[in-house]
Amino acid sequence: MDSAKIINIILSLFLPPVAVFLARGWGTDCIVDIILTILAWFPGMLYALYIVLQD
């Protein structure tokens, strides 16, 4: 696990949309994570962790 992935994991805990943006760019995944984070922070964080760990 390199340092960029560790930083993305930490970002996914505190700023989930930023972590998804860095992992996948601006697209459907980022929009879904923004919506999940606005509705409730915890689902947005879990989705961001899923995206970051999947790559």
UniProtKB/Swiss-Prot annotation:
One of its GO terms (biological process) is regulation of membrane potential. It is a multi-pass membrane protein. The chain crosses the membrane at residues 3-23, 31-51. GO terms for cellular component: cell periphery; plasma membrane. The keyword tRNA processing does not apply. Its main location: membrane. It is found in: Cell membrane. GO terms for molecular function: phosphatidic acid binding; phosphatidylinositol-3,5-bisphosphate binding; phosphatidylinositol-3-phosphate binding; sphingolipid binding. PROSITE patterns: UPF0057. Keywords: Cell membrane, Membrane, Transmembrane, Transmembrane helix. It comes from the Eukaryota. Belongs to the UPF0057 (PMP3) family. Plays a role in the regulation of membrane potential. Could mediate a proton leak. This is Plasma membrane proteolipid 3. It comes from Saccharomyces cerevisiae (strain ATCC 204508 / S288c) (Baker's yeast). The lineage of its organism: Eukaryota, Fungi, Dikarya, Ascomycota, Saccharomycotina.
